[in-house]
């Protein structure tokens, strides 16, 4: 099954990636299409999930709606091979990794990312790249690897998170 986690299931540049067209194409190939953009999308409507006008993934992860989406993914993984679909090419620049997969691995789900060139990257390797991105990959006397990884996730989340165009949207 393809699980679309885009907040808006439409492409400005490639109409074949619009929800209806994609759903029909996948159905012809016996692949189920599921839209979870409301539950797991990067642009959340819950105003309490914003800090200074930007989505805060640590707050999103605590919402009932997001937890429902994660549970649907866990349940779906029992029945199907799932592929999460979004718009970013590199897993570490997408909320798929920084928000969704981070929470799925806590539930014991094995994550493999398909890279732009078709190669497969284990989630652990994505996390290593994330640590390197912020120069947190070297051992530290004062912090565990998990603490450094948490910092890398937080910093990347801040970097890539959706920012409300109009702060009035959040009032």
Question: What is the meaning of each model-derived region?
Answer:
Residues 1-171:
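Residues lining hydrophobic/aromatic ligand-binding pockets adjacent to catalytic sites
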């Amino acid at each position: 099954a393809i699980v679309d986690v885009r907040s808006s299931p439409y492409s400005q540049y490639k109409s074949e990636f619009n929800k209806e067209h994609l759903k029909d194409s996948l159905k012809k190939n016996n692949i189920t299409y599921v839209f979870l953009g409301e539950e797991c999308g990067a642009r959340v409507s819950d105003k309490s999930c914003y800090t200074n006008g930007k989505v805060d993934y640590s707050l999103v992860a605590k919402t009932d709606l997001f937890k429902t989406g994660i549970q649907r993914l866990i349940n779906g993984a029992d029945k199907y091979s799932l592929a999460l679909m979004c718009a970013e090419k590199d897993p570490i620049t997408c909320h798929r990794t920084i928000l969704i997969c981070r929470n799925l691995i806590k539930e014991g789900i094995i994550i493999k990312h398909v890279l732009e060139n078709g190669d497969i990257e284990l989630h652990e390797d994505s996390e290593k790249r994330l640590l390197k991105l912020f120069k947190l990959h070297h051992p530290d006397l004062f912090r565990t690897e998990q603490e450094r990884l948490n910092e890398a996730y937080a910093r990347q989340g801040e970097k890539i998170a959706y920012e409300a165009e109009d702060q009035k949207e959040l009032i």
